[in-house]
A protein has these predicted regions:
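ATP/nucleoside-binding phosphotransfer catalytic cores, i.e., glycine-rich phosphate-binding loops
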Residues: 2-17, 36, 41, 47-49, ...
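Ligand-binding beta-strand-loop-alpha-helix segment within the catalytic cores
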Residues: 18, 23-45, 98-172, 232, ...
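A glycine- and small-aliphatic-rich helix-loop capping segment at beta-alpha/alpha-beta transitions
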Residues: 89-100, 122, 186-195
Length: 309
């Protein structure tokens, strides 16, 4: 039986093309049943205050960096979205006097315009946000060397190689409306993928690359980062891929309700917990990663029901 067309963008794959039973099962999850989805390799965490939520995310950076030594460089591959943890990271590093001399950081992604990654003068630049919200706030004597900061904005093969040369302790991130991590979006519904999206095995072969963004992602970034100004959001981005993700010891997804909604926060967890990987829901591919953690701000879980505004 052929899969339905997307309700949002018929020329693309996305979660609206799933078996309706999967969607219905996810929508039924209560706060209690969502928490019980934890299984070996997949752990659900709840936080009752937003302060604790972002402090816990910030501590992941610090805990990873404290493992780094001259003989064993260690890093973290971090997102822009969420960003609220970044100033807290800098404050903890400064307060505890933690030297980042041997620590590393990978930026997950960066916008691309006309085939070229945007510079830090672009208002939506992710590198710009990382430096303004975190790195420039760290005491100069504690900062990591610039060569230890890696963005997917140059030689992407070299960027990928660093994940083999350096231990990526943790890859934290958020979840987008397309159920992506980084910019691992669903693909267009054309060519060999006209009738079915890439298999999980095919999608997992993707490494860092420049990719076309799903219309949902463009709209979301205009809403969350650009005041709704869609014209200012690039249509392509360079992104970390599944290859680098599977070289990371832990994947840690933080959901405060700012980016995805109550249904989306349930759907990806359901598919990971029940091991239903489908590249129309890229986050579901993490069902096959050995160490995934989902962190929720409890008040954002809400319910999947009618709430008129």
């Amino acid at each position: 039986m052929s899969r339905p067309l997307s309700k949002v963008a018929p020329e693309w794959w996305d979660y609206t093309t799933l078996d309706p039973e999967i969607l219905a099962d996810a929508a039924k999850l209560t706060e209690k049943s969502l928490f019980k989805l934890s299984r070996p390799g997949f752990t659900v965490h709840y936080y009752d205050t937003i302060e604790e939520f972002y402090a816990a995310e910030a501590l992941e950076y610090v805990e990873a960096w404290r493992k780094a030594t001259a003989d064993n460089p260690v890093g973290i591959c971090g997102p822009i979205g969420p960003t609220e943890q970044l100033p807290i990271v800098a404050r903890i590093v400064n307060a505890l006097g933690i030297s980042l001399k041997h620590a590393h950081f990978w930026g997950m992604d960066e916008w691309v315009e006309d085939g070229v990654p945007v510079g830090m003068d672009h208002p939506l630049s992710f590198a710009k946000a990382d430096f303004e919200l975190c790195f420039n706030r760290i005491d100069k004597k504690l900062r990591m060397p610039k060569e230890n900061i890696h963005f997917p904005s140059g030689d992407l093969k070299a960027y990928t190689q660093t994940f083999s040369d350096i231990v990526c302790d943790t890859m934290p991130g958020g979840q987008g409306d397309t159920k992506h991590w980084a910019f691992n979006d669903p693909v267009r519904r054309k060519g060999k993928y006209k009738d079915a999206p890439p298999t999980p095995e095919e999608y997992r072969k993707l490494s860092a690359r420049v990719t076309e963004l799903h219309p949902i992602t463009i709209l979301q970034n205009a809403r969350t980062s650009g005041g709704g100004y869609v014209a200012n959001v690039p249509k392509s981005a360079a992104t970390v891929g599944p290859v680098e993700t599977w070289k990371s010891n832990k994947v840690s997804i933080w959901q405060a309700g700012t980016h995805d909604n109550p249904f989306g926060m349930r759907l990806s967890a359901w598919m990971i917990a029940k091991k239903i990987p489908d590249s129309a829901v890229p986050m579901s591919l993490l069902a096959d990663h050995p160490n995934v953690h989902f962190h929720y701000y409890r008040p954002a879980i809400k319910t999947v029901g009618a709430e008129m505004h």
